[in-house]
């Protein structure tokens, strides 16, 4: 099982635009259809992403645990690539066959349509 955990970050929207452009050049692709990942966030902006778990339930439970706060909730689970994008007021998660596809889906759904990648993983 693999994990990334981060606290609250601040970044300019232009960084998110540059990051999406870089993703188009070398976008990680999911390879493990039988592995699950999940992304969790807390009210204070803390978050965690896990991947390589044998079930969606175990992945979500681990993401919440690694998030580390009582307000942590799993935003999603995925067998491909999962991403959470942020802007000043929102966090939006999505998944897709590549990091680029997942990022586009999250940016299309986040209010305002812009943000930056905060957490991501591909199985």
Predicted regions: what is each one?
Residues 2-123:
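Helix-coil modules at protein/domain termini and other flexible surface or pore-lining loops
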